[in-house]
Amino acid sequence: MKVKSVIRLIENDGWYFVRQKGSYKIYKHPIKPGIVVVPDHGGSKDLSLGTENSILKQAGLK
């Protein structure tokens, strides 16, 4: 799955962009605890399966 697709998924779930440090975008949710860190090394690149699963778990989508 591409970085842009993952970002679209978590934003549709209510997560919002807080800040960026280097190539890493950090998102928060108004209700769910914690943060989600999305590596953005070029939005058109595919994420590895493990990274994708980790992001979705952080967001509570998996």
Predicted regions: what they are:
Residues 2-19, 26-62:
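Basic nucleic-acid-binding interfaces
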